[in-house]
Amino acid sequence: MSHLLEVKNLDVKFDTDEGRITAVENISLSVDQGEVLGIVGESGSGKSVTAKSIMKLNPGNTSYNEDAEIILDNENVLQFTSKQDLKKIRGGKVSMIFQEPMASFAPAIKIGAQMVEQLLIHKNINKDEAKSISINMLKRVGIADAEKRFNQYAFELSGGMRQRAMIAMALSTMPKLLLADEPTTALDVTIQAQVINLIKDIIKEYQMGVIFITHDLGVIAQVADHVAVMYLGSVVEKGPVNEILKNPKHPYTKGLLQALPDINNLDA
């Protein structure tokens, strides 16, 4: 059976005034329907560049190697050149949750209007149906007074509520693949736990594939089935999450594990 997503031999380079810089090199990974792949690594390791490549969201100075493939739903995304092809996947087949929701919402447009616009682009429905789906999804992610929030701007919501609204927007089109880029980093511990549980519930309910990006192996342990550890633009270790956590092979993975707090020895 083919994977929902398969990335093969991906190199991503950026052309700069100082020359061509390699951001990620020889990345190969896969995600199946209903599976969560965690990608973990420090800032600058290439996690987000890899994820954005799946939607071709990297900037205009980006180049990909000719033998690379990003096979999504049996199509090679790297061969997409028209806006129409890319529109099919951006917010349709693939949705992305970003670390900072204020960067995702247009500040001068109400949240509901943005959700409705996205649904009208990707679904064969009318405006009233799109509004109903949007409000129901806001309720689904635990936002009280969803009808009221639908008519508010992003800056009027708390940080945790904005994050939930962004998750609702990402999920409203029922994507096959969800890219979650550090979705809990900016939240306090209580809200972080709620958002993680919400994402887990929705994955189970809708059976979508997920790439969950973070610098925190503790979060990966809670949500992921498999994990890929990235360091300096390369995947240095990957496998089932329990196997990697119990028996890490690479020194960098061991270092990440050693940095986790020992809940059994908090007074040490």
Q: What role is predicted for each listed range?
A:
Residues I220-Q222:
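A short, surface-exposed alpha-helical micro-motif characterized by mixed small hydrophobic
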Residues H3, A144-K148, G239-A268:
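Short catalytic/signature loops enriched in Gly
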